[in-house]
Amino acid sequence: AYEMCGRDWSSDVCSSDLAMTLMVQAGHDPRQPHGRDLPDIEHLNADLKGKRIGWLGDWGGALPMEVGILETCEEALKVFDDLGCTVEKVAPPFQLELLWDSWITLRSWSIATSCAALFLDERTRDLLKPEAQWETERGLKLSAMDVHRASVIRSRWFEAAAKLFDSYDVLVLPTAQVWPFPVEWTWPKEIAGMTMDTYHRWMEVVVPAGLIGLPCLAVPAGFGAAGLPIGLQLIGRRGSDVALLRMGQGWHEAAPWAHLRPEVT
């Protein structure tokens, strides 16, 4: 309930399933500072005509992407055109490296609060994988001012994003910067020739929504040349969960996907 960065997620396969999950989980609770009641979402109205979609792409080149991801996502965005939405490219609304610095600071701080006891005890340290040890050690070295600076950036981004939602109902990013990679890899070491400086830099595309806890819905965009899948993040303003579910429902009705299978061997 008190995490600085959004990390809660659900793996429901469609908007209607997610709506049922939220009807069970969500709602006001005096023990939870951010809980709120939801309207009836059992029947989702999927009429999206007139909705404004902002496409952030690769954040003006700041996010390295493997070949084909942007093209597949941009082709998928045409579904919104068919639904009567307006899709526009959006210039980078904030310096991405600042968002990354804020996110990794708050994440390391959060991980350290959870794993410090294991890390500081030499008898249990090796129970943590190397990446967790690195992040815990990093978090333990942070000062109060480091966390404060990260929190200020987080607040500035929240304000900038809120202003952006005055022009757009939903912002869109790819769900990933890489196609699904071999199971033997722990994580991708480079993307499009750019070396990843941390074990989670390859997931930077999810930071803009996660850093400030915006509701985000992933929908399938399609398959690339190798038959591997990619999706779209549909990101809404704070409190727009129901509107985002309706957006996802409209997408699924216009672009049914459950019967599709990639041509892979």
Predicted ranges, named:
Residues 35-36, 101, 149, 181-203:
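Short, surface-exposed loop/helix-turn segments at secondary-structure junctions
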Residues 47-57, 105-162, 174, 178, ...:
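Short helix-loop capping/hinge segments that flank enzyme active sites or metal/cofactor-binding pockets
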Residues 7-71, 75, 94, 254-265:
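A short helix-breaking turn/cap at a secondary-structure junction
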Residues 228-237, 244-245:
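Short, well-ordered beta-strand elements
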Residues 1-6:
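Short, exposed "boundary/linker" segments that immediately precede the start
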Residues 7-25, 210-231:
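Short glycine/serine-rich loop segments
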Residues 62, 179-180:
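Short glycine-rich, flexible loops that bind phosphorylated cofactors or substrates
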Residues 65-92, 115-123, 147-168:
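Acyltransferase
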